[in-house]
């Protein structure tokens, strides 16, 4: 997918780029698959900020995505490729013979007119097909992977993401995650074949603050620009560096410090991600 750049007729346009939208074929979305989401802007039920640098952003409707792929053994046709304001991947509208319509994540290479199918048994290995991990050959790249059977896909759902099946052991399948982490997933879990499309999203340059505001991202103030009461890096006459290692506003080391708590599922992780 091509990335479009602009002539630098303003300073912000100089570095701004957008994705070419020629792959989007739909003029409008299916009304029955749209719903409203309450915008919290990073506030909890008391109205207090619990997640900083968030706001409502542009008005948008949520597209209901079929992450479970549980319409088994019925072949559907891809009727349209659509833009989804809530995710960086494109979505595909699948129409089934009984008139049912569902959105799925568009894998790279899936286009209008293609057929997709989901099954609990084995299928041909084609882009967009969904089946249980135990029926997918070793070496295949997959996306939209379940962590618990029937719960719906939770892993490798972002643009350009995929995991690779590396092997099997007892009731588990070994997957190499996008982070290079190796872990066990139950072989009864469903996954879709292929890589999530819109791979060039990572190369887009935001270019100007206004685009981030539309996305619901507020400006981020440096700790060194604050007062000592607001941040450990604050205070000092003029511009001063930090004493010691960089930390968060609450004193947690900011770079490389592990904050993940121990979980029962740690035993399913074979090796953690490799740092580049």
From Swiss-Prot:
UniProt-recorded name of the protein: Large ribosomal subunit protein uL2
Compositionally skewed regions (Basic residues) per UniProt: 257-276
Transmembrane intervals: none
Claim: Phosphoprotein is one of the keywords in the record: no
SMART domains for the chain: Ribosomal_L2 (SM01383), Ribosomal_L2_C (SM01382)
UniProt keyword annotations, A-Z: Ribonucleoprotein, Ribosomal protein, RNA-binding, rRNA-binding
InterPro entries: NA-bd_OB-fold, Rib_uL2_dom2, Ribosomal_uL2, Ribosomal_uL2_bac/org-type, Ribosomal_uL2_C, Ribosomal_uL2_CS, Ribosomal_uL2_dom3, Ribosomal_uL2_RNA-bd_dom
Any coiled-coil regions, as ranges: none
Pfam families: Ribosomal_L2, Ribosomal_L2_C
GO terms, molecular function: rRNA binding; structural constituent of ribosome; transferase activity
Segments for region (Disordered): 212-276
Organism ancestry: Bacteria, Pseudomonadati, Campylobacterota, Epsilonproteobacteria, Campylobacterales
GO CC terms in record: large ribosomal subunit
GO BP: cytoplasmic translation
HAMAP family registered for this protein in UniProt: Ribosomal_uL2_B (MF_01320_B)
PANTHER family: LARGE RIBOSOMAL SUBUNIT PROTEIN UL2M, RIBOSOMAL PROTEIN L2
Subunit organization: Part of the 50S ribosomal subunit. Forms a bridge to the 30S subunit in the 70S ribosome.
Family as reported in the entry's similarity comment: Belongs to the universal ribosomal protein uL2 family.
Keyword Ribosomal protein applies: yes
Role played: One of the primary rRNA binding proteins. Required for association of the 30S and 50S subunits to form the 70S ribosome, for tRNA binding and peptide bond formation. It has been suggested to have peptidyltransferase activity; this is somewhat controversial. Makes several contacts with the 16S rRNA in the 70S ribosome.
């Amino acid at each position: 997918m091509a990335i479009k750049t602009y002539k630098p007729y303003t300073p912000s346009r100089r570095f701004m780029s957008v994705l070419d939208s020629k792959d989007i074929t739909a003029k409008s979305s299916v009304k029955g698959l749209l719903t409203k989401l309450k915008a919290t802007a990073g506030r909890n039920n008391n109205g207090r900020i619990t997640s900083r640098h968030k706001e409502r952003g542009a008005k948008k409707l949520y597209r209901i995505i079929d992450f479970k792929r549980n319409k088994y053994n019925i072949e559907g046709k891809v009727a349209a490729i659509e833009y989804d304001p809530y995710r960086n991947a494109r979505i595909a509208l699948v129409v089934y013979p009984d008139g049912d319509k569902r959105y799925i994540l568009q894998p790279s290479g899936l286009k209008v007119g293609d057929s997709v199918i989901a099954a609990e048994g084995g299928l041909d290995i084609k882009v967009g097909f969904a089946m249980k991990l135990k029926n997918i050959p070793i070496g295949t790249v997959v996306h939209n992977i379940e962590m618990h059977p029937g719960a719906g896909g939770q892993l490798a759902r972002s643009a350009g993401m995929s995991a690779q099946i590396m092997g099997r052991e007892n009731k588990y399948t070994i997957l190499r995650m996008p982070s290079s982490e190796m872990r066990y997933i139950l072989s009864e879990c469903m996954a879709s074949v292929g890589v999530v499309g819109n791979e060039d999203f990572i190369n887009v340059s935001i270019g100007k603050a206004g685009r981030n505001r539309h996305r619901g991202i507020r400006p981020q103030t440096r700790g060194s620009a604050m007062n000592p009461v607001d941040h450990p890096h604050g205070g000092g006459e003029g511009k001063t560096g930090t004493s010691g290692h960089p930390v968060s506003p609450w004193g947690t080391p900011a770079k490389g410090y592990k904050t993940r708590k121990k979980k029962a599922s740690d035993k399913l992780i074979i090796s953690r991600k490799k740092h580049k």
